[in-house]
C-alpha cells in the first residue's frame, strides 16, 4: 500500500480487540497560548491524548511527563487514555476516527505507526494525519533475565545456536521485531521462538521474571530504574548509548547484522487527526506552538530527568520535519516487508 494513500473515513470505529482505558487528567496552568481558535475560545474543553500502549510503558510515561507542562503552555486540561492492542493499531484507529477539532491527539511511535498501514491493512495512511512534532528517539536494545548464562549479545547468539530460545518483542511489527528478525536472518544456524508481548511493560515484566531468554525493547522505555536487575546484552548500533551501560553490536564484532552501522530506534511523536490544520488552522497552530514551548520549560526537563534520564534523548522537530521523518521511516520499513511476513 502506498504510504501516501488517503482512505475514506469510515462511519464506525473499528477496533481489533478489547480496549483498556486508563485516564489521567493533566493540570491546567497559566494560559500562555490559548484563545487562538477560529472562534476565539479554544481550548474550552479537555484534550484527549491517546497512548496506543498499556499504562507504564515508555510511551505512556513520556506522555504523562509531558502533559502537565503542555497544560500550562496551552491553558487546557489533558486526559491521557490508553488504547493498547494490535501493535498500536487500536489506538491508531481511535485517532483516525476522532473529529479533527483540536481536542484529540496521540503520542504514537515510529516505526510502529508506519508498520500498521504497511503490514496490517490499517484503514489509514500517512496523509490521514497531521503532525505536531517529535518528542524523543530511543535506541533499540536487547536485554536478558538476571542469572542468564550469557553476558552480551555475542554470547547470546552462541548460546542460541545450541539451545532453543524465546525472544520477546514489544510488537509484531516495528523496531524491536525488526531487530530480532535481522539478527535471526543473519545467521543460518539461528532460529528464535519470537513472541509479541504487546508493549514495553509486559516485555519488562517477562524479562524480569525470566519468562523469555532475551527481549528487545528501548533502554529508556524498559526503564533505567532497572539497571542491575537485568543483563543489558547490547544496542543495535555501532556506537552505543549513554542511558544504560551496554556494549553496541559494533563493539561486539557483530557488524554483519544489518543496520548496525546506521543504528535505528523508536521515535515518539505527537499526531493529530487529519484535517485539523485545514479545518481549524488556528487551533492547529496553538497546539504546535504550545507543544514546542514545552521543550523550553525547565519544569518539563526536570520532570524528564526524574524519569530515568529521558531528558538526555529529548529531540523536538517541527511539524514539517516530523512529516518528512514519517515518510522516510515508511520507505525504510517497506524494504523489510519480506522479513515481517515471517513473524
List each model region and its residues.
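N-terminal secretory signal peptides and thylakoid transit peptides that target proteins
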Residues: 3-22
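C-terminal motif of bacterial Sec signal peptides marking the signal peptidase cleavage site
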Residues: 26-29
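N-terminal (or domain-start) structured segment
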Residues: 31-128, 185-216, 221-224, 298, ...
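Hinge/capping helix and adjacent helix->loop/strand transition within the periplasmic-binding protein
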Residues: 70, 94-102, 117-202, 268-302
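Solvent-exposed coil/turn segments that connect beta secondary-structure elements
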Residues: 110-112, 137, 147, 219-220, ...
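Ligand-binding pocket segment of bilobal, Venus flytrap-like solute-binding proteins
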Residues: 157, 168-247, 330
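C-terminal lobe and pocket-closing loops
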Residues: 221-302, 324-331, 335, 343
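Surface-exposed aromatic
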Residues: 305-326
Amino acid at each position: 500500500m502506498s504510504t501516501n494513500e488517503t482512505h475514506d473515513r469510515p462511519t464506525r470505529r473499528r477496533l481489533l480487540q478489547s480496549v483498556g482505558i486508563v485516564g489521567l487528567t493533566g493540570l491546567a496552568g497559566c494560559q500562555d497560548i490559548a484563545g487562538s481558535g477560529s472562534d476565539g475560545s479554544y481550548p474550552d474543553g479537555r484534550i484527549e491524548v491517546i497512548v496506543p500502549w498499556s499504562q507504564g510503558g515508555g510511551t505512556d510515561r513520556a506522555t504523562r511527563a509531558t502533559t502537565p507542562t503542555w497544560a500550562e503552555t496551552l491553558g487546557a486540561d489533558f486526559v491521557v487514555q490508553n488504547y493498547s492492542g494490535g501493535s498500536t493499531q487500536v489506538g491508531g484507529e481511535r485517532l483516525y476516527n476522532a473529529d479533527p477539532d483540536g481536542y484529540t491527539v496521540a503520542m504514537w511511535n515510529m516505526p510502529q505507526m508506519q508498520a500498521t498501514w504497511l503490514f496490517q491493512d490499517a484503514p489509514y495512511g500517512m496523509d490521514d494525519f497531521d503532525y505536531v512534532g517529535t518528542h524523543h528517539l530511543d535506541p533499540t536494545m536487547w536485554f536478558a533475565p538476571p542469572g542468564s548464562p550469557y553476558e552480551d549479545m555475542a554470547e547470546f547468539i552462541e548460546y542460541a545456536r545450541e539451545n532453543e530460545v524465546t525472544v520477546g518483542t514489544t510488537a509484531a511489527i516495528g523496531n524491536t521485531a525488526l531487530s530480532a528478525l535481522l539478527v535471526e536472518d543473519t545467521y543460518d544456524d539461528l532460529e528464535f521462538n519470537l513472541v509479541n508481548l504487546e508493549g514495553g511493560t509486559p516485555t519488562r515484566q517477562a524479562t524480569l521474571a525470566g519468562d523469555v531468554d532475551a527481549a528487545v525493547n528501548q533502554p529508556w522505555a524498559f526503564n533505567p530504574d532497572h539497571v542491575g536487575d537485568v543483563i543489558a546484552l547490547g544496542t543495535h548500533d555501532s556506537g552505543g548509548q549513554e542511558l544504560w551501560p551496554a556494549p553496541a553490536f559494533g563493539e561486539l564484532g557483530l557488524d554483519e547484522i544489518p543496520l548496525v552501522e546506521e543504528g535505528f530506534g523508536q521515535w515518539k511523536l505527537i499526531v493529530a487527526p487529519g484535517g485539523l490544520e485545514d479545518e481549524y488552522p488556528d487551533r492547529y497552530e496553538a497546539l504546535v506552538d504550545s507543544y514546542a514551548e514545552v521543550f523550553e520549560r525547565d519544569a518539563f526537563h526536570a520532570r524528564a530527568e526524574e524519569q530515568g534520564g529521558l531528558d538526555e534523548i529529548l529531540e523536538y522537530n517541527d511539524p514539517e520535519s516530523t512529516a518528512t521523518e514519517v515518510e522516510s521511516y515508511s520507505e525504510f520499513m517497506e524494504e523489510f516487508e519480506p522479513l515481517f511476513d515471517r513473524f
